[in-house]
A protein has these predicted regions:
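Charged, often Cys/His-bearing segments associated with DNA-binding zinc-finger transcription factors
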Residues: 1-35, 39-43
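Polybasic low-complexity intrinsically disordered regions
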Residues: 2, 8, 75, 79-82, ...
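Secondary-structure capping and boundary motifs in well-ordered enzyme cores
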Residues: 33, 51-58, 97-101
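An N-terminal domain-cap segment
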Residues: 38-58
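Short amphipathic helix-turn modules centered on a small-residue break
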Residues: 42-45, 89-94
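Alpha-helical scaffolds flanking conserved acidic
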Residues: 54-61, 76, 80-81
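Alpha-helical support elements that line or immediately flank enzyme active sites
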Residues: 59-71
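Short, intrinsically disordered, charge-balanced linker/junction segments flanking boundaries
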Residues: 252-259
């Protein structure tokens, strides 16, 4: 009897895939143009003129890459950098005291979102990985993550960011953005990212999270009916029908930052 593939089984598969993190991150180290990206981000980063000296920009960029590639919350990526040898080596830290806390990581992510850099840099990462055949493309898991932002959030023009919105989740209201992601089922790596206001419904972003080569697509109850929408991707690039395997039970949306 074939065992039905559930989200818990998928999680187990992703955990096994991550045992090769060290080798993968060593490849990332060689192919990502860190100096170029630091130059792009620096004008938006803290100048360190008042208060405590900001964390090294390259360290924050490396943590950002880990967070986005492995779909980790602010607190989770902080703990992983502390606990995982592969992550700490990639970030160049050898003491927990060198690792920024979750709030600091969240504020850095907000800086990138507010200046339109999160998607730009992430898409460059995925383009590089795809050209190096470092991402498998058999199945995609779609999900979304809330990115909290202060109500005073401003964009690069110093105006109130109109892309940030409020949404009610359960009994709580959240203000900020939503990161919609497409995750490779086999490697656990995020291959597509779309940032919208927090009030954007999960299912509407589904086509933007697919690369077109998947045979199967997985999602929670927020994606019910995705295959029936007018803009649905029903066949992959090989002409085969994509199997939509949507879990009827709701998942708990992660809230990444409290800044």
């Amino acid at each position: 009897m074939n065992k039905q593939l559930t989200f818990s089984l998928i999680s187990d598969e992703l955990a096994q895939a991550r045992t090769s993190q060290k080798e993968f991150l060593e490849k990332i180290e060689r192919i990502i143009p860190f100096d170029e990206w630091i130059g792009i981000i620096r004008p938006c980063y803290y100048k360190g003129e008042h208060g405590n000296k900001p964390y090294d920009l390259e360290l924050m960029l490396r943590i950002f890459l880990l967070q986005n590639l492995y779909d980790l919350s602010d607190m989770k990526v902080m703990n992983e950098v502390i606990d995982s040898r592969a992550f700490s080596d990639f970030c160049g830290v050898d003491s927990p005291n060198q690792v920024p806390d979750g709030d600091t990581i969240g504020r850095f992510r907000n800086i990138l979102v507010e200046n339109g850099l999160q998607e730009k840099l992430f898409h460059q990462v995925i383009d590089i990985l795809s050209k190096k055949d470092l991402i498998l493309k058999r199945g995609t898991i779609v999900d979304s993550t809330l990115i909290a932002a202060p109500s005073s959030t401003k964009n690069k023009d110093k105006k109130r960011d109109k892309d940030a919105h409020s949404v009610k989740k359960g009994n709580q209201w959240h203000f900020g953005y939503k990161a919609h992601i497409g995750v490779d089922k086999d490697s656990g790596l995020v291959h597509h990212l779309k940032v919208t206001g927090a009030n954007e419904h999960d299912v509407t972003a589904t086509p933007d999270l697919m690369h077109g080569e998947e045979e199967e697509l997985y999602g929670d109850s927020g994606y019910i009916g995705a295959e029936k929408r007018e803009n649905a991707v029903v066949k992959n690039k090989n002409g085969r029908k994509i199997k939509y395997k949507i879990n009827r039970k709701p998942s708990t949306m992660k809230k990444l930052s409290k800044s």
